[in-house]
Amino acid sequence: NIPYIQFNGIVIDRIGMEESVLYVDMRHELENPYGMAHGGLLFTLVDTAGGVTARADGRKYVTMDASIHYLQSARKGRITATSRTVRRGRTVTVVDVNVTDEEERLLARGTVTMFCLDAEESNVKS
């Protein structure tokens, strides 16, 4: 239950240790001045997908680093973020995220590095 995610209309469809799926249905409030999905929305999807995937192990995480490559624009319909865990360690989890539209066009690709706040209490081995 994260107010910022609810505010943006992001829906968490599936959460898993290896893969998670989130989506948002485009609406006017999420557009940039040119009628396309705002870059901040795509970045939020990448960051959120990385975070929920990291937290699937039951621990608390914050974003340590994130990068994104914007590849194509989207103007309407559903935008989906699909994450895949690259590495899950004791203190750091790295997640790759692809953002696609309804036609499966790749809109953005990002990598999120998540830092575990409660790593000292964890039994996860790096």
Residues of each region from the PLM?
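Terminal targeting signals and extreme-terminal segments of soluble enzymes
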Residues: 1-126
